[in-house]
Amino acid sequence: MVPQAHGLLLLCFLLQLQGPLGTAVFITQEEAHGVLHRQRRANSLLEELWPGSLERECNEEQCSFEEAREIFKSPERTKQFWIVYSDGDQCASNPCQNGGTCQDHLKSYVCFCLLDFEGRNCEKSKNEQLICANENGDCDQYCRDHVGTKRTCSCHEDYTLQPDEVSCKPKVEYPCGRIPVVEKRNSSSRQGRIVGGNVCPKGECPWQAVLKINGLLLCGAVLLDARWIVTAAHCFDNIRYWGNITVVMGEHDFSEKDGDEQVRRVTQVIMPDKYIRGKINHDIALLRLHRPVTFTDYVVPLCLPEKSFSENTLARIRFSRVSGWGQLLDRGATALELMSIEVPRLMTQDCLEHAKHSSNTPKITENMFCAGYMDGTKDACKGDSGGPHATHYHGTWYLTGVVSWGEGCAAIGHIGVYTRVSQYIDWLVRHMDSKLQVGVFRLPLL
């Protein structure tokens, strides 16, 4: 009897486990997913308890970023691994040349080059790229190429080459080509575009000189040194007695004296022996002052550049500054305040083409260049002759031209012609060191 009771109880228990009659044999998709989903991959319950294995988690099977982070612990190491794991190693082909080191990035790479190389793949030699024809060799001022070695930089005598071997720092209180009043207020000099131009604020054209005869305006000029100025040779074409000529530095407004002016007499006038009166070829003159001027915030020389620097670098700069007190309009009144204008330099071919179609334009030679606006809105004018055409480069201004000739003030379709100073740099330097006495001299260019 007892065994039968036990069997009956067992049967009831099994029926209870099966559930009520009519229960469905299959479960829903959501329930099945809940049963089958595994939070972590492992071959056994014990493996879930083991520390993460790179071989097991990511090499044998595809792993997620979260799983990789559990393995590496460090976010930085995880990121480095994941870039290669998910995208492939962009450095595998060794793209960096000349000993460069490759760093893999997502779908890209970066090469860290050795000191003498540059470029995306370190393919460019700096010694080959750093030549004076390429952006002046990155030099602040003067650049010189050397066969077999990289270029070297140097500076004007008023400056010192810095340890970086490219920068030039002033070594005197008033170096040439700098504008003290602008630097002291730490602002940019106005870049206005003498006809249609702007007043040059006091002190912002500190190299501007003015030649006067018997107290009247004769020509403009430019200070190169404490004792020397440059102007146009044609300014003396009709002067019988040059002893009446004075030079004024620090002048700004003809209608008033403010105490910053310095007046000097002229003791020497030196012209090229090939200059012919009434012609404009070789239109340049060097004047010696009877005693040096004193450099101040309002009297500073303009830098006379090296010839190669002027021809290869400065000549490529489109806009330069011209200044003077010339007539504001053709046959009009002379300006009382110093005026300045930014003029574009014209291509030599355009200049020659213009001269070909103009009966008034002189024959353009290699000793000249043209600048100005063909619409006639802005131009140098009579009275500006001899004034500076100054070009700015890396914080310093240089003398690139001397105002020589123009067809009236801002005549439509006409341009200004300037003496190309680079043709006379050697001549100027040579005679600034001369021991000539008082007088007018015509000296050979060679």
UniProtKB/Swiss-Prot annotation:
Residues 87-123, 128-169 form the EGF-like domain. Its EC number is 3.4.21.21. It comes from the Eukaryota. One of its GO terms (biological process) is positive regulation of blood coagulation. The modification (3R)-3-hydroxyaspartate is found at D104. Plasma and liver. Residues 1-24 form the signal peptide. One of its GO terms (cellular component) is extracellular region. Keywords: Blood coagulation, Calcium, Cleavage on pair of basic residues, Disulfide bond, EGF-like domain, Gamma-carboxyglutamic acid, Glycoprotein, Hemostasis, Hydrolase, Hydroxylation, Protease, Repeat, Secreted, Serine protease, Signal, Zymogen. Residues 25-41 form a propeptide. The active site is at H234 (charge relay system), D283 (charge relay system), S385 (charge relay system). PROSITE patterns: ASX_HYDROXYL, EGF_1, EGF_3, EGF_CA, GLA_1, GLA_2, TRYPSIN_DOM, TRYPSIN_HIS. The vitamin K-dependent, enzymatic carboxylation of some glutamate residues allows the modified protein to bind calcium. The iron and 2-oxoglutarate dependent 3-hydroxylation of aspartate and asparagine is (R) stereospecific within EGF domains. Disulfide bonds join C58-C63, C91-C102, C96-C111, C113-C122, C132-C143, C139-C153, C155-C168, C176-C303, C200-C205, C219-C235, C351-C370, C381-C409. Initiates the extrinsic pathway of blood coagulation. Serine protease that circulates in the blood in a zymogen form. Factor VII is converted to factor VIIa by factor Xa, factor XIIa, factor IXa, or thrombin by minor proteolysis. In the presence of tissue factor and calcium ions, factor VIIa then converts factor X to factor Xa by limited proteolysis. Factor VIIa also converts factor IX to factor IXa in the presence of tissue factor and calcium. This is Coagulation factor VII. It comes from Mus musculus (Mouse). The lineage of its organism: Eukaryota, Metazoa, Chordata, Craniata, Vertebrata. The gene is F7.
